[in-house]
Amino acid sequence: MEASYKSESESEAWPGTQRPGTGTVSTAVREHLRKLCLREFPCGAGSWNKSRFLPQTWRTWRELVPKEEDVVSPGEETVEALLGLVRSPHSPWALLNDSNAEDSFLRELAIRNPLMITDTFFYSYFRSLRVVDKEVTLVDKDLLKFLKLEELVLSANRIKEVDATNLPPTLKVLELYGNEISSMECLCAHPPAGLQHLGLGHNKLLGPLESLYVTADHWPNLVSLDLGFNDLTDLQSMVASLRTLRHLRLLVLQGNPLALVPYYRGLTIDSLAQLCVLDDITVSPNEKHLFRGLSLNGDLLAQEAQFVVTIGNIRGVLDTSVLDPEPGPEGPFVAYSYYVTYDFVRDEEGEAVEDTGELAEIVKPSPSSELLVDESPEEVGEDVIKDIVGGVTEEVEGSLESEVEESGESELSVISGPSTVLQTPRASAEELAKLRLRIDPRLCPSPGTVLFNTTHKPWAEVIPCGYEMQHSLRDLVPLKAFLLAGTTVTIVEEKILSWPVVLPAVDSPLSAKRGKGEKDKKGKEKDRKGQGEKEPAKEWKVPKKKKELPKELRQDPPILQVLGRGLVILEPLLAGEPLVSTVCNFGMVRTLTSDRLTLARDSKKIKKVAKKEKPKAVNPIYESDYHPEPLTVEVQIQLNQCRSAEEALRMFAV
């Protein structure tokens, strides 16, 4: 039926559809109106409703006929039938799913009174325009034609700069969320005087100078301001500028580096007394009381963020030692230990790290570890080998054995092949260069980060790490990027092979001299007996137990194996959450066979318990009841936040 219909303006161009260029706001608006098909069936004027729009003189004679019913001409549709076509969700002319109530109103208006659909109508009708995710790059001057426009939403586009002279003076709401604007300076050239809301969240505003553009000189009537998730720094300068906005009631600053300092919320609330909502959280009277007076000393507060990283228990670790054969007298003697590593951002301005729990080890990225990122780590260049050799040589000359005993881990985390040992501290660089060092890329920190690890612990069903580390950072922009990326947590197994050292028997001059002295002593005693002299009484000595001297062992470089590795999302800390607490689950690594071997070993130990003690029964493991615990580790990262003005001044006053 509709195939026979023909639009009266089918051959005409849509008014105002000339496209001056792609990527403009006006082009996106026209494209949207074109998709509404306001001049095509069942909207607009055409053969389906042309009798309704005949000149009045042609219809006069019909009106003179008494009691004549209005009859639709053959081939035409009633208004109700046409409205049914656009309202029915099953109709091919139904609106698209992303359409709004305004689109529905325009289509019905184009059916009831299609002659109203003109450029003049559009420019005077629209009070709100929403152009979202349309690849818009330019706010063009055609927007000035919208005489009553009050709200302009241009979210999720690719706008880098806004010419404020192209904004209608009637504008009250300007939303530019999710664009690529790097400075507010372009908006301040000729801002709409009556603007009440400005949204610039998730853009690329950077640095402390942006505070110059949020004053009452540019936005005298601003009530709501969204600057969240940019790279704004210098909280003190920002709140000093915002203080001039007397009408400001709603403010969003979370997601910026300046919001990571512990006193951020308190200083902002005390500086902006008229503020009602900060970061979508209502400002309470109690908060205003707790932080009263903090703004008077705001310039004395250090601009740094503080995090506390806590690592709890490791569970579900495979006891690898039960898979090794019993060592013979010649070795090797195997020792296993387990620890957790995580990376944290490096502070270019000098990181202050405080260990508030057990001793924490820091593995700083060496030049070699940063370069070895290939999947085949055996392919090591000569330059890299030289760097590694240099670092190893320095460690060797500084008493290699004592370093290993104190730290429990060589600074270069290497995975060795066949056992290769540094026999003497004076090993030459040529010998060291022959070592085939293999560095696991998974144990190297990401660029711009430092690798931290817990102390090494022996195997247990539950391995308690007891780790707590405080990180204080002043370089806040890289810190924000790190929080967006997250930290990588790794569980590492360290295996060290030890071998007995066989010392060659060498006759020294000291031992020869000692032997000669004993021989002379025996000769004198013999002469004394021959002369009849009495032998002096020998002192009675208590027999002592023979002490077994500990065998001297040499150790191979540690063999490191990554048992589990995963990413911990830290973005909630940037979005205002004070704590991220999670249990990293790396799946099953234990097997029924390994657990049975562990059970058998433990049962042997129980049999050796003293006879007085009643041995505990060990339940056997059956395959039907076997439910191994997955490999997990507890991780918690907290962003420090001050709860009062007194606490902020005590902790951060310079």
Swiss-Prot record:
LRR repeats lie at residues 148-168, 170-191, 194-213, 221-242. The keyword rRNA processing does not apply. Pfam families: LRR_8. Residues 515-542 have a biased composition (Basic and acidic residues). InterPro entries: Cilia_flagella_integrity (IPR050576), Leu-rich_rpt (IPR001611), LRR_dom_sf (IPR032675). Keywords: Leucine-rich repeat, Repeat. Residues 256-294 form the LRRCT domain. Residues 1-25, 510-548 are annotated as: Disordered. This is Leucine-rich repeat-containing protein 43.
